[in-house]
Regions:
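Electropositive, glycine-dotted interaction segments
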Residues: 85-211
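Short alpha-helix of the ABC ATPase nucleotide-binding domain corresponding to the H-loop/switch region
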Residues: 273-278
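Conserved ABC ATPase signature
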Residues: 22-24, 220-254, 262, 268-272
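Post-Walker A helix-loop "phosphate-sensing" segment adjacent to the P-loop in P-loop NTPases
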Residues: 41-53, 257-258, 287-289
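C-terminal lobe/lid and adjacent interdomain/linker elements of RecA-like ASCE P-loop ATPase modules
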Residues: 259, 279-351
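Pre-Walker A-like glycine/lysine-rich segment at the N-terminus of P-loop NTPase domains
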Residues: 1-41
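Flexible phosphate/Mg2+-sensing switch loops adjacent to catalytic phosphate-binding sites
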Residues: 45-66, 306
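Short, hydrophobic/aromatic-rich segments at coil-to-beta transitions
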Residues: 65-74, 97
Length: 351
């Protein structure tokens, strides 16, 4: 994310001098979905959210001889004054073996879960010097120290511990949208009622000119309507299939995740025309300016300097190598190049 080139176009893909919006291409089976699980494992570990809902417990590459997998995340907080490196090791989705937190080059703690003891520890950032022994006596065998600190109020709200935890909570994985219409609960209908103007703006942005309203029915339930000059008509019964696909996309993904730190859209445009996919990217770039947003797709029409740039377009090889287009060729890529055409002609190294 820090490997930013000096392109002067599509600056909205860059956030705080980091790549903030990217598209990843790769053959089926290259690992795009697994990449999302690896990147977003921080949320699973710190919040125990089980968002991945995996049906297996292993997390290492199936070809690897290592039983332990290491995850390392680097953050810059407080206007980049504090560099936080958080590292942990796991044998499977649920069991930690080691956890290390480093702030500005100093190890604050290193914990061995197998031995149930701190290998290294520093009292910096903690008001209570007994915090380490309290944790050891009261924790379960695989509860991250960071999570325990935050949930027990052992650190200040403004601390890097809380900031890292809040970042993890807001990580969102979004898998291939479905064309099946979802049934909304009463709470979701209430949420839609509060966001009906935002939904209307979204559809208008996508080129569907309409006015919407939520109406209360005699039985107390709510229903979404198109508003025309002389009457209102039920939205779900009269919207086109394309409009319903966008409605589903908004309801399932955009409405509940307005403040995401990371948004990983896997095969986000599987059911959308490429022009609509382009509009969705533009919309999300505008609405999620401070978020890290990653799209995966097979749509080479989106491989364009019009909406992206060569350092934000990536190829994931079957060997697991992630390479930006600007480093996948010896050619100096310029704004006027047709990147999609170059890709189809075999310009970029995919090994």
């Amino acid at each position: 994310f820090s490997d930013v080139n000096g392109y002067k176009f599509s600056q909205d893909c860059i956030t705080n001098d980091l790549i903030g919006k990217m598209i990843i291409y790769g053959k089926n089976g290259s690992g795009k979905t697994n990449l999302s699980k690896a990147l977003c494992d921080l949320k699973e570990t710190l919040t125990m959210s089980n968002d991945m809902k995996s049906n297996h417990s292993f997390i290492s590459n199936a070809n690897s001889n290592n039983e332990i997998t290491t995850f390392t995340y680097t953050f810059l907080f407080n206007n980049k004054k504090d560099k936080v490196v958080y590292e942990y090791q796991k044998t499977d989705l649920f069991n930690l073996t080691n956890e290390v937190l480093n702030i500005n080059g100093k190890i604050i703690y290193s914990y061995d879960f197998n031995k149930n003891r701190f290998i290294e520890k520093s009292e910096d950032y903690f008001h209570n010097s007994d915090i380490f022994s309290i944790y050891q006596k009261n924790t379960n065998p695989s509860l991250p120290f960071v999570r325990w600190l935050v949930n027990n109020g052992a650190v200040e709200k403004s601390s890097v511990f809380n900031k890292m935890y809040e970042y993890a909570v807001k990580i969102t994985q979004i898998f291939t949208p479905t064309t099946a219409l979802i049934q909304l609960s009463r709470n979701e209908l209430d949420e839609l009622d509060r966001n009906v103007n935002d939904l209307e703006d979204f559809l208008n942005y996508m080129g569907i000119e309409c006015k919407l309203s939520m109406e209360k029915l005699p039985d107390g339930s709510k229903e979404l309507y198109f508003v025309f000059k002389n009457r209102k008509v039920a939205f779900l019964e009269n919207a086109s299939s394309g409009t319903l696909s966008l409605f589903n996309f908004y309801i399932r993904f955009l409405m509940p995740h307005k403040e995401s730190s990371i948004l990983y859209f896997d095969e986000f445009d599987a059911f959308f025309h490429f022009e609509l996919s382009e509009k969705i990217i533009q919309y999300i770039k505008e609405k999620y300016k401070d978020s890290l947003v990653i799209f995966t797709t097979h749509n080479t029409n989106l491989m364009s300097n019009k909406i992206m740039r060569p350092d934000t377009l990536f190829i994931l090889s079957t060997s697991g190598k992630l390479t930006p287009l600007c480093k996948a060729t010896d050619r100096e890529l310029r704004e006027g190049h047709n990147l999609g055409k170059l890709y189809m002609n075999g310009e970029f190294d995919e090994d």
